UniProtKB/Swiss-Prot annotation:
It comes from the Bacteria. This is Nigerythrin. Fe cation 2 binds at E73, E115, E149, H152. GO terms for molecular function: iron ion binding; oxidoreductase activity. One of its GO terms (cellular component) is cytoplasm. NCBIfam families: Nigrythrn (NF045783). Homodimer. May possess two rubredoxin-like centers and two hemerythrin-like binuclear-iron centers per dimer. Residues 169-202 form the Rubredoxin-like domain. Its main location: cytoplasm. CDD domains: rubredoxin_SM, Rubrerythrin. Exhibits NADH peroxidase activity (in vitro). Keywords: Cytoplasm, Electron transport, Iron, Metal-binding, Transport. Residues 23-168 form the Ferritin-like diiron domain.
Amino acid sequence: MKVRAQVPTVKNATNFNMVADSKTAVGSTLENLKAAIAGETGAHAKYTAFAKAAREQGYEQIARLFEATAAAELIHIGLEYALVAEMEPGYEKPTVAAPSAYSCDLNLISGANGEIYETSDMYPAFIRKAQEEGNSKAVHVFTRAKLAESVHAERYLAAYNDIDAPDDDKFHLCPICGYIHKGEDFEKCPICFRPKDTFTAY
């Protein structure tokens, strides 16, 4: 993802359209925030399990990618939970059962499929509803999550294609929006403009 002149938003970017055959059940913005938290919670658990499996199968770099992405999902959960807590004090985050993990290549495809769904279906639908309700905070949070998820999908597909040809590159996680950069050739987050020296390396 290239750094733009301004932070990308639904107003200045053209990749916020929603798929025609949407599988997302859209409710109120509060309900959508809760649904997003549930989805991100499941993703965090899944990627944590996938990281463990990748390491056991000898894919150290891919294990670090799964760990970075699991941490990114925690960032999204925190942002979404903060909004829910404002709207519904006392709300408790959901829990999920420990997921299964499979061969590393299949885990990467599973991860990519989930990230593509969130990028092309779930978050665009939630952004649209938040706009209708005039909830600018939710639009902001959903937008940053959507943009980060598209990069997560890209990272998973690249790792899948190069599974037998790993390199030594580290993954760098933005602490604000969950963007993940591979390698050292960047100065700031292209989504929220956070400087490189605040990122966490995996």
